[in-house]
Each structure stands twice: as structure tokens, then as C-alpha cells.
Amino acid sequence: MSVIDLPEFFYKAILLLIESGVILGSLGVVLFTNIVYSAFLLGWVPVCISFLYILLNADFVAAVQILIYVGTINVLIVFAVMLINKPQYFRFLKYWTVGDGTALALCTSPFLSIIAAILSTPWSKISLIVLSNKIVEEPLTDNVQRIGFHSLTDSPLPFELLSIILLVAPVGAITMARREEAVEAEESEALKTKDDFPF
């Protein structure tokens, strides 16, 4: 039984939870001053959006949503952790400026317009597009279709290993760069000590 076959009450409850997760995650991204917390919440938003695709019986789109966006945000988290040297102090709200108020005003109007459009749209009259089995049984003539099909069916392990290698490579490069900076800092401190005590 698919999610769409659930009773309408459960469907609305699940949809409300997903929308709440998207809104709260988006607010956390812009309100948290710690970049690591913001990056984690930025990864939570595409996950909630993928749940919306699952409600629409678009499983493949939901999986691609998680693989692409959440994977990219994980790389962002790694870069944030490795490149930020100064200590991060937790503070939920920062001091508001004129630019913050202007940005809030510019973002609120389209946000309210989208909410009005969502509420005024007759969603119950929109028919769901269900893919038939004929599309799956058709021969794969496109190279992209062949690569995607064999990568996710015949050889998923090399596909995942490739993604891990692409993640490990920048992490290793950043680690080596930071290690060289630490060695240079220790050498400069040693030279200062020799200058202070020439005897």
C-alpha cells in the first residue's frame, strides 16, 4: 500500500509535519550563527522535501533529492569544520541591522504569496501522474539511462565507493594544508623564543 492510499486524516497530518520541518529548518539556517548548525539544518530541509516527493509516489526523485543535495551539504559541513579555526560561540539571534530588516521584508512578501497560492489551489482536483510499467520495460537507448540503471542495480558498491573517494579527497587536502600551517606556526614560535633568549 502506498502512502497515497492512506486515509485523508493521516495524509494531512504527515503533510503538516513535513511542512513544519521545512519551515523550522529554514528558519534555523538563517537564525543560527554557528555555521555547523546551519549546515546541518540546511541538510534537514532537502530531507523533508524528499518526504513530499514520497507522498506523491515519486520515489526516484526523492532518492535523487537526498543523494545530491544532502551529499553536497555534507561536503559543506566538512569544509566548515576544517576551515574555521576560531571558536564558535552559540548565539541564537544576532544583532539586527537595517539590511536584515530589508531582507526580511523582501522575503516575507513572496513567502506570503506562496502560502496564499498553496491555500487557494484545489489540490484535490489535481490528478497524480503514475508511471506505467511500460516505461520501465522499454529498452534503454540513452547513455545516461544505461549508466544510471547499471550504476544503481548491477554495481551499487563501486558507485558508493566513488562518492566516498570524492568526499575523502577534499578532506585529506584540507587536513594536509592545516598541518602545514600548524608546522609553520610552531617554527615561527620557536624563532621568536630564540630571539627573546639570544644566550
From Swiss-Prot:
The keyword Zinc-finger does not apply. Keywords: Chloroplast, Membrane, NAD, NADP, Plastid, Plastoquinone, Quinone, Thylakoid, Translocase, Transmembrane, Transmembrane helix, Transport. It is found in: Plastid, Chloroplast thylakoid membrane. InterPro entries: NAD(P)H-Q_Oxidoreduct_6, NADH_UbQ/plastoQ_OxRdtase_su6, Nuo/plastoQ_OxRdtase_6_NuoJ. Disulfide bonds: none annotated. It is a multi-pass membrane protein. The chain crosses the membrane at residues 13-33, 35-55, 64-84, 96-118, 157-177. Its main location: plastid. GO terms for cellular component: chloroplast thylakoid membrane. It catalyses: a plastoquinone + NADH + (n+1) H(+)(in) = a plastoquinol + NAD(+) + n H(+)(out); a plastoquinone + NADPH + (n+1) H(+)(in) = a plastoquinol + NADP(+) + n H(+)(out). Belongs to the complex I subunit 6 family. This is NAD(P)H-quinone oxidoreductase subunit 6, chloroplastic. It comes from Huperzia lucidula. The gene is ndhG.
